[in-house]
Design a protein with these regions (language model features):
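Carbohydrate-interacting regions of secretory-pathway proteins
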Residues: 19-222
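Sec-dependent N-terminal signal peptides
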Residues: 4-14
Length: 222
């Protein structure tokens, strides 16, 4: 009995995560049943254009329906976000991260991993880009109407990676000299708070088109 207890203690101690090591604990942001982990940007509840069908979050652009960006209740600093998205027809959306609720839209503070019906290596506003700043290096998007698997990773040190369908699309360091040079050469140059929020919300953008999301989960990397 003592021997078994000792072995168990050694196992537990040697498998404890250390500071800075990523956790294996995933928080399920969407369980296929409800939007309890979300609300609207600067609103208490999601717009009623955001619906759930067949365990999928769907933004439906129908007359009389109110959309707006769908935003996480929680705030995140260093994390790995995994999800799948689909454009049922050509359109535009995005995953905006480290969002602060200030004057103006979510993208005034948060960088965006672009969702679009077009993807070409080098396209700064194409799918997978950090919108208008860092283009995807490869094209890995599936056909319109098919699902795409995304991993958005922000590591300590503000090192960001965009992955889609098992391909690394781009990587960069927020706040670096290269980052700042690109921001200063973009439409964001006069947006004082852009990319400066250290811990913020994640938004699924309503850009006026239908977009679907599923299998949304996140884990801390600090």
């Amino acid at each position: 009995m003592i021997k078994s207890f000792t072995l168990l203690s050694i196992f537990l101690l040697t498998n404890l995560p250390t500071y800075g090591e990523e956790s294996n604990h995933w928080d399920i942001l969407f369980d296929g049943k409800n939007l309890n982990n979300f609300r609207g940007y600067k609103k208490e509840k999601p717009g009623n254009a955001w619906t759930i069908e067949d365990k999928v979050i769907k933004l439906k652009k129908e007359k009389g329906k109110v959309g707006g960006d769908l935003m996480t209740q929680g705030k995140y600093r260093f994390f790995e976000l995994q999800l799948e998205w689909c454009l049922p027809k050509p359109g535009n959306s995005g995953i905006i991260f480290r969002v602060g609720e200030t004057d103006g839209p979510a993208y005034k503070t948060g960088p965006e991993m672009q969702i679009f019906h077009k993807m070409n290596p080098g396209g700064k506003t194409d799918t997978g880009s950090c919108y208008a700043l860092y283009p995807p290096k490869v094209a890995s998007m599936n056909k319109i109407g098919e699902w795409n698997k995304v991993r958005l990773v922000i590591k300590p040190g503000n090192k960001v990676e965009h992955h889609m369908n098992e391909k690394l699309l781009c990587s960069y360091t927020m706040g670096s000299k290269d980052w700042q040079n690109r921001v200063n050469s973009s439409k964001f140059k006069n947006w004082e708070l852009f990319g400066t929020v250290e811990k913020g919300h994640i938004c699924f953008q309503d850009h006026g088109n239908e977009v679907w999301f599923r299998k949304v989960r996140i884990k801390s990397l600090q």
